[in-house]
From Swiss-Prot:
GO terms for molecular function: DNA binding; zinc ion binding. The keyword Transcription does not apply. PANTHER family: RECOMBINATION PROTEIN RECR (PTHR30446:SF0). InterPro entries: DNA_Rcmb_RecR (IPR000093), Rcmb_RecR (IPR023627), Rcmb_RecR_Znf (IPR015967), TOPRIM_dom (IPR006171), TOPRIM_RecR (IPR034137). The keyword DNA repair applies. It holds the Pfam family RecR_ZnF. It comes from Prochlorococcus marinus (strain MIT 9312). SUPFAM superfamilies: Recombination protein RecR (SSF111304). Keywords: DNA damage, DNA recombination, DNA repair, Metal-binding, Zinc, Zinc-finger. GO terms for biological process: DNA recombination; DNA repair. Belongs to the RecR family. This is Recombination protein RecR. May play a role in DNA repair. It seems to be involved in an RecBC-independent recombinational process of DNA repair. It may act with RecF and RecO.
Length: 199
């Protein structure tokens, strides 16, 4: 077992908390940081603190923004009557890269997962229902990960929104359990085109 000096060990431990970062990658990142000039580290620290202090959630869709509403919600050229529901902002970004979707989004902040003690009350589902019930929405597209949790969440939301509008789910050309974030743009574009009706 490798023994690090305490400050380095602490830094590696912090990097390991990042999603997708294992012990070896955390070690590489920590060693990279130590090689940087102090001015670079100060700038990086400042950028982290500024982002954490100044970036919040859009009051409409819960995407990240530094204003009350995000750029997508404020864009009058987007179809405000077409809402795509995603679990996380990273999924929204993946769909934006595909350049196929012209509507707006609603970020629910995760998936229903009883095993992880995540119920619907911990997600932005109630705000979605309120948003749909108070507006004229033509269609809700559910773009949630093809997994047990994704299916559960889609069915739950589909039942809640069925009285208000048409609810569809994007088609998938990828295996069960795949993360939306890692799907290529062409597959995502086809998934949007081939969406199926839920209600």
């Amino acid at each position: 077992m490798i023994t690090y000096t305490k400050p380095l060990s602490k830094l590696i431990g912090h990097f390991e908390k990042f999603p997708g970062i294992g012990p070896r990658t955390a070690q590489r990142l920590a060693l990279f940081v130590l090689k940087q000039p102090e001015s670079t580290i100060r700038d990086f620290s400042k950028a982290l603190l500024e982002a954490h202090s100044n970036v919040g959630r859009c009051k409409k869709c819960f995407n990240f923004t530094s204003e009350d509403e995000c750029e997508i919600c404020k864009n009058t050229e987007r179809n405000q009557k077409l809402i795509c529901v995603v679990a996380e902002t990273k999924d929204l970004l993946a769909l934006e890269r595909a350049r196929e979707f012209k509507g707006v989004y609603h970020v629910i902040g995760g998936l229903i997962s009883p095993m992880d003690s995540v119920g619907p009350e911990l997600l932005e589902i109630r705000s979605l229902v309120e948003r749909v019930s108070k507006s004229e929405i033509d269609e809700i597209i559910l773009a949630l990960t093809p997994s047990v949790e994704g299916d559960t969440t889609s069915l739950y939301i589909g039942k809640l929104l069925a009285p208000f509008t048409k609810v569809t789910r994007i088609a998938y050309g990828l295996p069960m359990g795949s993360e939306l974030e890692y799907v290529d743009e062409v597959t995502l574009a086809r998934a949007l085109e081939g969406r199926t009706k839920l209600n």
